[in-house]
Structures are given as C-alpha cells and as structure tokens.
Amino acid sequence: MTTIRNEIEINAPIASVFEYYTNPDNIKESWPREIVKESENVSGQKSEEGSEMKVTGEYMGKRDDMLLEVVDKEQNKKLVTRQTQGPFKRWESVQEFQNGQKNYTRVVHTIEYELPTTGKIGNFLTGSQAEEKIKQGIQQAAQTVKQKLESKSV
C-alpha cells in the first residue's frame, strides 16, 4: 500500500473550497490533462454518500475508467471516495478541510492505493512511476484549485 499526502492553504472561504473540490466535474479541470481525461457524476446526487463518479484517465498511454463511490461526507469537513471498479487493486482518496486564520482554508488530501499485479496498469507502471505520476497530479490539482479560487475565476 502506498500513501501520498498533499497539504495546501487556499485564501478562500471553506464553503467555496469544499464545493469546488468535491464537485466531480472539476476533477478534469484541475488534474493534469495527461492523467485525467474526463470526470463526471454517474449516479445519485453529486458527491453525496453512495453516489458514484467516473474518472477516465490515461496511464502510460493506456486509457482506463475508474468508478469511485463516495463513502463518507461531512459538509465543509471531509470527503472520502473509494474505487469500486478500475485499474488499481485498491484506491481511496480522503480530502479534509479545515478553517484557517483570516479566511484561509487548509486542505489535506491523502490518497492510498495499491497497484495490481496484472492488467493494463500493472503491466505498464512500476511502483515508483505510479507514485511519481499521482504525486505530480495531486500537487498540480491543488495548485490549480488554489489559483482558480484565489483569483475568483470559478
């Protein structure tokens, strides 16, 4: 099991940051285009417990879909999604939101995953390659969200 953690402070109200981060449509807008191609809500209310979203990504030249289910949500505090179908043996994403000083919001995003031993992604990515790609993606996504929310271009 590999764990990747990213923290960022965004100069915006917690409600705005939570709303942007937890909208499935924004995943494709914030993650690097070479990793995430599409993202959309596929069942239930957007980002409510039990709802599912589909993220289409590209892993070392191979396109694949990941179905994620929202398994825990606390408004303006936390969103947990887990892969129910997709290229990873296991994938869980935990986004935590905390009120900071002077209208800042602290976001802690932790992804735990396990690569499969077979299949598309298992054949094309080594552990360190996958970790580097995911680390770059989570960092770039956080910076993109920060820029959008701080410039109010949402």
State the predicted function of each range.
Residues 39-85, 104-106, 139-154:
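Glycine-rich portal/gate segments that line the openings of hydrophobic small-molecule binding cavities
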Residues 22, 32, 123-126, 150:
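A generic structural signal for secondary-structure junctions
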Residues 10-12, 59-61, 72, 87, ...:
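Beta-strand elements of well-folded, non-transmembrane domains
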Residues 83-136:
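Beta-strand/loop substructures that line and gate deep hydrophobic ligand-binding cavities in soluble
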